[in-house]
């Protein structure tokens, strides 16, 4: 192979490893080289072997050695990259006036917030910022059967964690008297009527595009039935329907429900009301009276635009501009309460903060930064194309935020004992980060160490290995335990470099490794791996929730004194 290509591969491998905690992967470098040298796409087999050898060689180097080689051979790879101003994907708004744009985020408090809620909140928030406008948080709390204060609180906590700020906070239920007033106005104008048909008859008539007898009643009869809805009719016996078009191709327009009876106690207003607006009626009225100029929601609501406009036209009220975007989901990570709730009830998932889920609580617990979520969502832009993203797309953004501030610690899994003779000291000082000044830590050592079982399998008798931050060790015996002798000032090139933990002060923790929850439509029984591992006593000094990188393993978040959660490589 051309020496120039080998040179380029090594530079890419060193740079990528250096930027990602000292490790890189064959497939990453293969992708990079094929991107810069497309002529090699017909020679993938030929170059793959060379890439594997170079990657293996680079991964054996410590971060300090990687940096040194780049400084000597590839200084351009360490040079600061010219910052390119990126436009983050939000197109300009139609009919937008600087300082006059009003957007809103109207979550229903019927579940824990997830990545889809984050997308809606961030898009609406960013548009308000873009135009120096106003952003409203409006809890869409008009279904007492499904809504709870715990969900209301969880949404506010999640939005606060995301760093989203609002100019106004309200609840849709604040305006119940307005909905009653507008409902009566529609009835009196003949644009709405009270329907007492059975639910199954209503559904059949809508399918067959036929009007029912209730739609023929006069205003007087409808007003009497409205009064009966206050205290006589039971839930399901009467509803207020909008007089749309029963022949319409858009089924949403076939005389939809505006108001219905729900005899459940509301979590804030109690039992003051029993007639509650439908989503379409509530959002139409609220957006108009709140002064919303641009209303964005996910595209499954797109067919409802016609209805919302029709309701506001019937009432002579101002209409906002309406925009739509695709739902955001991750492959194999459901956001639907219909799927998540049974998993919790069956014990397959622990709670809504289970790190395998895409809820905001779960993402926070897993170690995903809110800044990464925002950057990721903004990178998607305002598209209506389906967004079923792989989770590693978010991981790539998160890595940029956690790397600089994540303390490096040693951790070993499947621990194997190693006894070392002739050590020169009882304390070793190790930097907390290979590049950034995060200080140093002192590790007390004796002759007894733990190393990872995976590493021990690659060690041969009479070979020399390097314990990172400590020095070279010549292995003199291999068995249930390994033995070796410390070599002062040994050459570190082309030898295995591994992390370690002193047996005397080793702290045992449980490592939780979340994996994809569903393969296609099937629950993955192996979606959560648990490992018993040893780490340094320094782990106990970390704050709960602190992000760290276990050397040669990956980024993790401290969940408790005795447990860590794997974030990503």
From Swiss-Prot:
Organism of derivation: Nitrosopumilus maritimus (strain SCM1)
Q: Where in the cell is it found?
A: Cytoplasm
Which purpose does this protein serve, as stated in its record?
A: Catalyzes the attachment of glutamate to tRNA(Glu) in a two-step reaction: glutamate is first activated by ATP to form Glu-AMP and then transferred to the acceptor end of tRNA(Glu).
Q: Does the keyword S-adenosyl-L-methionine apply?
A: no
PROSITE patterns per UniProt:
AA_TRNA_LIGASE_I
- Chief localization: cytoplasm
Question: Which EC class is the enzyme in?
Answer: ligase
Coiled coil stretches, renumbered: none
Tell me a Gene Ontology molecular-function term this record carries: glutamate-tRNA ligase activity
Return the motif ranges for 'HIGH' region: 107-117
Q: Name one GO biological process term.
A: glutamyl-tRNA aminoacylation
Q: What's the domain of life for this entry? A: Archaea
Q: Name one GO cellular component term.
A: protein-containing complex
| Enzyme Commission number(s) from the entry | 6.1.1.17
* A Pfam family reported for this protein in Swiss-Prot or TrEMBL: tRNA-synt_1c
Q: Does the keyword Protease apply?
A: no
Q: Which UniProt keywords apply?
A: Aminoacyl-tRNA synthetase, ATP-binding, Cytoplasm, Ligase, Nucleotide-binding, Protein biosynthesis
Q: Which reaction does it catalyse?
A: tRNA(Glu) + L-glutamate + ATP = L-glutamyl-tRNA(Glu) + AMP + diphosphate
Q: What is this protein called?
A: Glutamate--tRNA ligase
Q: Which family does it belong to?
A: Belongs to the class-I aminoacyl-tRNA synthetase family. Glutamate--tRNA ligase type 2 subfamily.
């Amino acid at each position: 192979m051309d020496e120039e290509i080998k040179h380029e591969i090594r530079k890419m491998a060193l740079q990528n490893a250096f930027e990602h905690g000292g490790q890189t992967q064959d497939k990453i470098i293969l992708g990079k080289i094929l991107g810069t040298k497309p002529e090699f796409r017909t020679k993938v087999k030929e170059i793959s072997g060379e890439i594997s050898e170079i990657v293996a060689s680079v991964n054996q180097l410590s971060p300090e050695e990687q940096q040194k080689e780049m400084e000597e051979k590839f200084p351009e790879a360490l040079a600061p990259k010219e910052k390119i101003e990126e436009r983050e994907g939000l197109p300009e708004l139609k009919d937008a006036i600087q300082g006059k744009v009003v957007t809103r985020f109207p979550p229903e408090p019927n579940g824990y917030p997830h990545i889809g809620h984050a997308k809606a909140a961030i898009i609406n928030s960013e548009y308000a910022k873009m135009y120096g406008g106003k952003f409203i948080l409006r809890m869409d709390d008009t279904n007492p059967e499904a809504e709870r204060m715990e969900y209301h609180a969880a949404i506010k906590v999640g939005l606060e964690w995301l760093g989203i700020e609002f100019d106004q906070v309200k609840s849709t239920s604040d305006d119940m008297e307005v909905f009653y007033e507008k409902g009566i106005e529609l009835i009196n104008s003949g644009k709405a009527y009270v329907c007492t048909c059975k639910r199954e008859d209503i559904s059949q008539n809508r399918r067959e595009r036929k009007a029912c007898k209730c739609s023929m009643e006069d205003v007087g009869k409808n007003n009497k039935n409205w009064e009966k809805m206050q205290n006589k009719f039971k839930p399901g016996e009467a509803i207020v329907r909008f007089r749309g078009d029963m022949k319409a191709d858009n089924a949403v327009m076939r005389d939809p429900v505006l108001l219905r009876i729900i005899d459940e106690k509301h979590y804030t207003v109690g039992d003051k009301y029993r007639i509650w607006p439908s989503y379409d009626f509530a959002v139409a009225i609220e957006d108009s009276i709140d002064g919303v100029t641009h209303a964005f929601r996910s595209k499954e609501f797109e067919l409802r635009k016609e209805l919302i406009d029709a309701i506001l036209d019937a009432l002579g009220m101002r209409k906002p501009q309406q925009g739509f975007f695709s739902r955001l989901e991750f492959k194999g990570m459901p956001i639907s309460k219909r799927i998540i709730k049974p998993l919790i009830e069956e014990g397959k998932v622990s709670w809504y903060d289970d790190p395998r889920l895409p809820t905001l609580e779960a993402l926070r617990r897993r170690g995903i930064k809110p800044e990464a979520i925002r950057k990721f969502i903004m990178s998607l832009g305002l598209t209506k194309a389906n967004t079923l993203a792989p989770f590693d797309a978010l991981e790539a953004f998160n890595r940029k935020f956690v790397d600089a501030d994540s303390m490096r610690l040693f951790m070993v899994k499947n621990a194997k004992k190693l006894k070392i003779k002739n050590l020169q000291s009882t304390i070793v000082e190790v930097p907390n980060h290979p590049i950034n000044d995060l200080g140093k830590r002192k590790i007390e050592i004796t002759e007894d160490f733990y190393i990872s079982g995976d590493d021990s399998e690659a060690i041969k008798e009479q070979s020399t290995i390097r314990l990172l931050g400590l020095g070279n060790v010549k292995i003199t015996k291999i068995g249930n335990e390994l033995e070796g002798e410390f070599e002062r000032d040994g050459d570190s090139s082309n030898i295995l470099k591994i992390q370690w933990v002193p047996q005397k002060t080793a702290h045992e923790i449980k490592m939780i490794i979340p994996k994809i929850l569903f393969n296609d439509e099937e629950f993955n029984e192996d979606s959560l791996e648990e490992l018993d591992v040893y780490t340094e006593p320094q782990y106990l000094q970390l704050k709960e929730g602190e992000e760290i990188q276990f050397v040669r393993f990956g980024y993790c978040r401290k969940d408790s004194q005795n447990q860590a959660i794997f974030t990503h490589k």
